[in-house]
Amino acid sequence: IFFFALIPLLALLGIHMYKYFTDKELECKHCEADGIDPAFMQKVDKLRGELGFAFPITSAYRCPDHPIEARKNTPGAHASGRAVDIAVRGDQAHKLLQAALNAGFTGIGVSQKDGVRFIHLDDLPDSKERPRPHVWSY
């Protein structure tokens, strides 16, 4: 826990927590807040390293005021800081799905139609509001 408290200080010093992802791509696109869960991102970073191909993150942390979150009755997985959307398609999408299931990600959303192709990953615990494990399509 102490280590994770040092993350903002490390960022100020130009030291990044993750091998494959920048702080900028993980912050809220609405307000630039840094709310991503470090333990969650360590899992994503490890997955990226194992697969060996780029994971362009289109959405990570979203503050409660983010337009997508503000439309919801209760904040979604992104507002918890434990979700990312990864732009991926074709055989890489297939490889990512297999690896994410093996790595223990509990929420997997798939959008592979038209120009919007991404896979949502989260690791939320099972709850009445959000049953996990769960897979859905957009």
Explain the meaning of each model-derived region.
Residues 12-54:
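Active-site acidic/histidine clusters and adjacent loop/turn architecture
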Residues 19, 24, 59, 64, ...:
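Flexible, active-site-adjacent loop/turn segments at secondary-structure boundaries
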Residues 75, 79-84, 88-138:
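Catalytic cores and adjacent binding grooves of peptidoglycan-active enzymes
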Residues 30, 55-61, 91-95:
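N-terminal start-of-chain detector that recognizes signal peptides
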Residues 1-14:
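Single-pass alpha-helical membrane anchors
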Residues 44-71:
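Extended, low-complexity, intrinsically disordered C-terminal regulatory tails
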Residues 25, 65, 70, 74, ...:
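Solvent-exposed, flexible loop/coil residues
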